[in-house]
Structures are given as structure tokens and as C-alpha cells.
């Protein structure tokens, strides 16, 4: 695989991980409220 495609895949994976973390944090905040 070429470098640009690898970089795009990593960016997408990082964005997905950040979205999951944000959702988990929001759920924790809602549960604590």
C-alpha cells in the first residue's frame, strides 16, 4: 500500500477512535448526572 493511502487509513482510524471515546465520555457524564 502506498504512503498516502496508509496515512488516510490511519486518519480515519484515529477519527473513529476519537468518536468512540467522545461517545463513551458523554455516556459516562449522562450516567453521572
From Swiss-Prot:
Keyword Protein transport: no
First and last residue of the signal peptide: none
Keyword terms of this UniProt record: Antifreeze protein, Repeat
Family: Belongs to the type-I AFP family.
Function of the protein: Antifreeze proteins lower the blood freezing point.
Protein name: Ice-structuring protein SS-3
Source organism of the structure: Myoxocephalus scorpius (Shorthorn sculpin)
Amino acid at each position: 500500500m502506498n504512503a498516502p493511502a496508509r496515512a488516510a487509513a490511519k486518519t480515519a482510524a484515529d477519527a473513529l477512535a476519537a468518536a468512540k471515546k467522545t461517545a463513551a465520555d458523554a455516556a459516562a457524564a449522562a450516567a453521572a448526572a
